UniProtKB/Swiss-Prot annotation:
Listed name of the protein: Mitogen-activated protein kinase 14B
Listed cofactors: Mg(2+)
Organism annotation: Danio rerio
Annotated positions of the Phosphotyrosine modification: Y183
Matching PROSITE patterns: MAPK, PROTEIN_KINASE_ATP, PROTEIN_KINASE_DOM
GO cellular component: cytoplasm; nucleus
SMART domains: S_TKc
Family the UniProt entry places it in: Belongs to the protein kinase superfamily. CMGC Ser/Thr protein kinase family. MAP kinase subfamily.
SUPFAM superfamilies linked: Protein kinase-like (PK-like) (SSF56112)
Domain Protein kinase, first and last residues per copy: 25-309
Active site, UniProt feature: D169 (proton acceptor)
Cited Gene3D superfamilies: Phosphorylase Kinase, domain 1, Transferase(Phosphotransferase) domain 1
Compartments, as annotated in UniProt: Cytoplasm; Nucleus
Entry GO MF terms: ATP binding; MAP kinase activity; protein serine kinase activity; protein serine/threonine kinase activity
Amino acid sequence: MSQKARPTFYRQELNKTIWEVPERYQNLSPVGSGAYGSVMSAFDGKAGLRVAVKKLSRPFQSIIHAKRTYRELRLLKHMKHENVIGLLDVFSPATSLEGFNDVYLVTHLMGADLNNIVKCQKLTDDHVQFLIYQILRALKYIHSADIIHRDLKPSNLAVNEDCELKILDFGLARLTDDEMTGYVATRWYRAPEIMLNWMHYNMTVDIWSVGCIMAELLTGRTLFPGTDHINQLQQIMRLTGTPPASLISRMPSHEARNYISSLPHMPKRNFADVFIGANPLAVDLLEKMLVLDTDKRITASQALAHPYFAQYHDPDDEPEADPYDQSFESRDLEIEEWKSKIYIQNRN
């Protein structure tokens, strides 16, 4: 791998933080900040477009931080798909490993997220088809690389004025219990098996989330706005019914088996009665996504071939990803070792 030529950097203080960026990035202005860093929009003079520049907060604060930084960099570098956020540039002002403390990532600047769009307007069935088709097209690609998003929700789906969609923040989420507690959107879109640790989950946790998102686009309301884990599960089972004995017996968790078995029996509702007025094909697809048994839940590839997407589905234009080496996930390295790996990724 060849090394990038080092650009000229300039310094600027924004929101009480020093930003040190290459001269090609001008007119920095704050977009937002989260637990893992803050984001500025900037004009990329070289490419002639506005971009998002993310400065990771304390990327090497702990082994967990350093590994997360490495994971994010590797994932973004691997993703090359129209419906998935990819990496345009990565840089650090450091000239040596010793001085390497900051990591900046540059991605496409996306305008609204799906949350903004649902709040502002009632979507037509055609809009819903196109948006959900793009999410599934992205998931087919991500899942083919053995990557699970784990945290799909409307705020992680960026949409531009042409209704073109990109998935953000994927594969990073190894969410802790406290982030899932209470009346939080993070949990409303979560598959029950991941929320309650029922069993080893698979790629279809993301399909459950798509079902929740699709239902919300069709109705304008959150499908399962649970106030806590238990209430969330009750809301889910009012629609899906309680799990059959055959599914309960496959749950490795003794606690989960006992708890689910103790619940009063609830029958599955007729989805057509719940989603009144929706396209029958949309209802049929929802019924195949919102299935408690992960082995029976539809996959992204299967969903793309569903008749609901007849006007968009093109098997020759729904690509898969190159294999993605995740062997680093099982490695226990020291902070300095992760830092060195990130430095090499940053230089190339």
